Structures are given as structure tokens and as C-alpha cells.
Amino acid sequence: MRLDGLSVSVKRYKAKRAETRSKPQPTHRNEWWGTDMTKFYVHGLGWLYLVIVIDWYTKRVLGYSLGLRPKTDLWLEALHQAVEVACPAGSRSEDVHLMSDNGSQPTSTRYETILETLSIEHVTTSYNNPKGNADTERFMRTFKEEVVWPNEFESLEEATRAVDEFFLFYNQDYPHSTLMGMSPIDFEASLNQTQTAAA
């Protein structure tokens, strides 16, 4: 993917404790993405960290990464996966907006620089108020309900397999009322059919 010549202005919500922000409402795919990190315990290993990038319009998880340390590399791996899945040709008709919290990893100089290189506009939630990233937070809760809370993982391999299987199921088969009962992949297919018919 060619990245030369791409630039973007970095935008953030002001970090004020009393400030509230409503969640942006996307009107098409690749307009608003959300990213976030969670962790869960693996016996004999410790905490395992998960970072995801999700398209708010299609509800598709575009990228995810697992690691033993909550480093910026983990966030970048999920981000690069998302770009490769959503924009395999390396081009977009307009910029993507990426919503995150104010954590040290997504606000690091390294992460911000990569976003600028990819022409992705970074927006952060207001201080101590994750409402702006509500769709991403909602997915993380679904992940915990479906994968983390019902299970006790005994190894990294077991945890990784469960995560991989869930994301495959979620994207291909998990129905959403906001998508007219379709899964993210099926909804994307319907969008493609509509665009083809209109061409």
C-alpha cells in the first residue's frame, strides 16, 4: 500500500471532566471506526490483552490483536489489519475517522504518526467519558459475555483459539437488529449489491 503524500489533521475532543459528547452517527462504511483494549485472565500465564478495530456502520470487526503486554505495537497491529481488510487497494474516497479513549497507547506519538501517515483522522473521547466510543464499548461487553465470562482459559493456545473462533462467528453469523437482522458480512454483501445495482 502506498502511503506517500497522505496527510491529515489530528482532531481531539477537549479533555474536560464535565464535558459530555454524543456518539457520531455514521452514514456509510469506513466513515467511523472505533478502537479499544480489554484484558482477561489466563491461568498460569496472567493477563492477556485484546485490541480491536470495529466499523460502526457495518459492525464488522476489521482488525484485532492479542498480546501479553499492552504496548502500542498491539494497537498498531489491529489498526494495520483493519486498513488491509477495509482498504486492500490502499485508497479511500474520503478519510476514515477513528475514535479511541485517551489511553497512553492510542495517544502516543508513534500511534498518532502512523494515523497521520494513513490519512486517518483521530478523535478521542472526552476525559472520563467513553460515551463517544459507545459502539466499541458495547462490542467489548458482548465479547466478554460470549467468550470471557463463561470460560476459564488454561493456556494461551486455548484463549487464542476461542478468540479467533468468536471473531469469525461474530463477523459471519452474529445477527444485529440495527442491520435488519443480518451479520456484518451479510450486511456488507447487501451494500455491495445495492451499489452494483445503482452503478
Tell me the role of every PLM-derived stretch.
Residues 1-199:
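Charged DNA-binding/catalytic regions of mobile-element recombinases
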